[in-house]
């Protein structure tokens, strides 16, 4: 529009968005430019096209990936009692967390002696024991998990549970735990949301509040450590979901996204 803003504006094009590592690279920008607030936007299939969707407080969940390896003792398949095969320990853990794999809502619940105020879940994304060798009772096995929670402090509860479980196996197995792809809770500052939504409505943009957070994660949540933040979605209408083989970005939502940022800048 060739108009000057009374604010200094930084356009942040962040790398490595999919694994949670890129946001941390951008930390020096907040210190250098003294950022007062930050806004983010993402397209979203299967929400009404060209509508801005928002939420105060939790917008998207916190999550982290764990890779847990157990090493026991190999033996001949005819003498499994002489070895320590990790398959039973890993299978017992997989069965124990099955209720957490079935959590889909954001209501309070209790798992064993752990209490959660909202969604908390664990997804098994990989599990492997031994190899295709019918003469061996294997010594090695691993399980890989995505831990996810609406609240960061409750993601920490899930982490304590998992670590405690495998700490209890250290007399029988060598245990290794690696961490991957940590994402903070994507949290929208309620005051910033209220002010911004009023401005968007006044500018003629259609807005709608999400009834609950999105279960996926987004490393935009990291930025709330440095400034009040707000993250919204632009609906794409009915179409294949993000990351689906048939997904195609719809250019027709770009003007809505640009208009939203123009309003924010003003």
Question: What label would you give each PLM region?
Answer:
Residues 3-126, 130-137, 217:
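Histidine/acidic-residue-rich, glycine-tolerant segments that coordinate divalent metal ions
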Residues 69-77, 140-148, 174-179, 238-245:
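A short small-residue
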Residues 208-265:
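Zn-dependent metallopeptidase/amidohydrolase metal-coordination segment
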Residues 123-130, 146, 175-197, 211-221, ...:
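A short beta-alpha structural unit
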Residues 124-128, 133-178:
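Oxyanion-binding "anion nests"
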Residues 88-92, 96-100, 109-114, 136, ...:
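Histidine/acidic residue-rich metal-binding segments in metalloenzymes
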């Amino acid at each position: 529009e060739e108009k000057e803003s009374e604010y200094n504006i930084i356009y942040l094009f962040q790398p490595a968005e999919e694994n949670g590592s890129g946001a941390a690279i951008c930390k020096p920008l907040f210190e250098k430019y003294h950022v007062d607030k930050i806004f983010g936007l993402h397209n979203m299939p299967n929400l009404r096209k060209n509508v801005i969707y928002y939420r105060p407080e939790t917008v998207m969940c916190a999550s982290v990936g764990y890779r847990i390896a157990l090493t026991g003792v190999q033996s001949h398949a005819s003498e499994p009692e002489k070895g320590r095969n990790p398959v039973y320990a890993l299978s017992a853990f997989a069965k124990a967390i099955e209720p957490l794999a079935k959590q889909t809502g954001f209501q309070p619940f209790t798992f064993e002696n752990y209490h959660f105020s909202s969604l908390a879940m664990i997804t098994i994304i990989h599990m492997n024991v031994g190899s295709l060798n019918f003469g061996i009772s294997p010594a090695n096995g691993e399980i890989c998990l995505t831990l996810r929670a609406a609240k960061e402090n409750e993601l920490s509860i899930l982490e304590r549970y998992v670590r405690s479980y495998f700490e209890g196996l250290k007399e029988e197995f060598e245990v290794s735990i690696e961490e991957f792809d940590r994402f903070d809770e994507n949290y929208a500052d309620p005051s910033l949301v209220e002010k911004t939504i009023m401005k968007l409505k006044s500018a003629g943009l259609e807005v709608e509040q999400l009834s609950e957070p999105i279960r996926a994660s987004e490393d935009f949540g990291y930025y709330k450590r440095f400034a009040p933040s707000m993250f919204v979605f632009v609906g794409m209408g009915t179409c294949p979901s993000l990351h689906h083989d048939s997904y195609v970005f719809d250019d027709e939502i770009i003007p809505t996204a640009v208009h939203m940022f123009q309003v924010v800048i003003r």
